[in-house]
Amino acid sequence: MDNLSNYLIVSAVLFSIGTIGVLTRKNAIVVFMCIELMLNAVNLTFVAFSRHLGNLDGQIFVFFIMTVAAAEAAVGLALFIAFFNNRESIDIDDANLMKW
């Protein structure tokens, strides 16, 4: 196997772990971390293909994805803090109680 295959296998494993975590966990912070893991798996794929093809387009795209992910993390954690202050729990099953 060449290097691209190794990177894609690692990326697929990371994405699978993230997907399983999103589907099975009930803690919102753990689900959020699993979503970030899936996002980083996609970033690894972009960088691997960018290096394999010899251009920087994928790496530039990853830079923008990481910028958006940082903003997403800040907003997501602020929402978790507000949810915890309101319900004193971060369980996903309690999130449906915040309906108007």
Swiss-Prot record:
The keyword Nuclease does not apply. It is found in: Cell inner membrane. Keywords: Cell inner membrane, Cell membrane, Membrane, NAD, Quinone, Translocase, Transmembrane, Transmembrane helix, Transport, Ubiquinone. InterPro entries: NADH_UbQ_OxRdtase_chain4L/K, NUOK/Mnh_C1-like. It comes from the Bacteria. One of its GO terms (biological process) is ATP synthesis coupled electron transport. It catalyses: a quinone + NADH + 5 H(+)(in) = a quinol + NAD(+) + 4 H(+)(out). Its EC number is 7.1.1.-. Pfam families: Oxidored_q2. GO terms for cellular component: NADH dehydrogenase complex; plasma membrane. NDH-1 shuttles electrons from NADH, via FMN and iron-sulfur (Fe-S) centers, to quinones in the respiratory chain. The immediate electron acceptor for the enzyme in this species is believed to be ubiquinone. Couples the redox reaction to proton translocation (for every two electrons transferred, four hydrogen ions are translocated across the cytoplasmic membrane), and thus conserves the redox energy in a proton gradient. Belongs to the complex I subunit 4L family. NDH-1 is composed of 14 different subunits. Subunits NuoA, H, J, K, L, M, N constitute the membrane sector of the complex. HAMAP family: NDH1_NuoK. This is NADH-quinone oxidoreductase subunit K. It comes from Trichlorobacter lovleyi (strain ATCC BAA-1151 / DSM 17278 / SZ).
